[in-house]
UniProtKB/Swiss-Prot annotation:
Protein name: Large ribosomal subunit protein uL16
Organism of origin: Endomicrobium trichonymphae
Gene Ontology terms: biological process: translation
One Gene Ontology MF term: structural constituent of ribosome
Claim: Magnesium is one of the keywords in the record: no
Amino acid sequence: MLMPKRVKYRKMHRGRMKGKAKGGVSLAFGKYGLQALEPVWINSNQIEAARIALARSIKKGGKVWIRIFPDKPVTKKPAETRMGKGKGDPQFWVAVVKPGRVMFEMEGIPETEAKKALRLASNKLPIHTKILVRADI
């Protein structure tokens, strides 16, 4: 499960996901990529499920890059607890993904297999996505 080794502060504000992604919007490593079309919090379990789906689909043929990392803690108060008395304890970690962000990249396999693998990975994520293909000039 992905999470930071150390953080300066245990708890964070929720924040807002306004606008489009500023960075990480184009393919940087691989030939094929999976791009987000909606703003969403993706937790570490969902990233891991998509990674496993990609790895099983491509077997030992290609290489996969994960371009997002869950570095935001999400807190939760215990069940049947009254309001107040401070913020709850961190429960899981999320990556804040805005529209346009490339989440996964891959290379080393044919285009049809890559698109099939990325489609399987996108089914594991709670978000609409688009498959990108690098145009070599």
